[in-house]
């Protein structure tokens, strides 16, 4: 399995603290593989951590942030062929397929189902082996996530995904990654261009759009992360052991007193 990464910020190698932004991605996917004999696609990220190699298009699973996936290989379709199709044809997706996922670190990306269980939305995007430029834009304005494509050679954006109520913290990193397995393809990221968008907000919107510290989507329940308990200090451990011993001694003394009292009462019955 081969992975390729381009993990960096678009603004001077620092985290992105823009409130409203637009990321334009100029990319190209091409190769010699015929239908469904190529893979696996590329991902564009806005995440808390820099690149950590893993199974999700080359990045770590259970990431924290936003992932946008240009998936070129239909894993679920192959599963369905083997299992007599678990879904009706009406819900089949045509690949290549673009989807988005917001994660707070608690969710796993399901490769066998091409991310369907955690998908915010998606669209078909025929992007392989085209003879003109292909672009993808991710726009985040007033907690509104919009993804558009320019893949027809007409220099026109067409809607792909639109999700309101997306809450993304500031200070995360932009990056791209790709991965191949038994099949392969060429995934070229030609440019990443980040733009700050100037947006006016009413006082009410200012209150509603305060900074958040964990990614989430309104009306979508994400499992809460449970923080591990901090290790006990030496003093705390000593106090626990000390009071446990005191309690044990106290219990033994009470037990002896009650036993002696019971014996005295037993003797009185015989005299």
Q: What do these predicted regions represent?
A:
Residues 1-271:
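Polar, low-complexity loop segments and adjacent catalytic/binding residues used for recognizing
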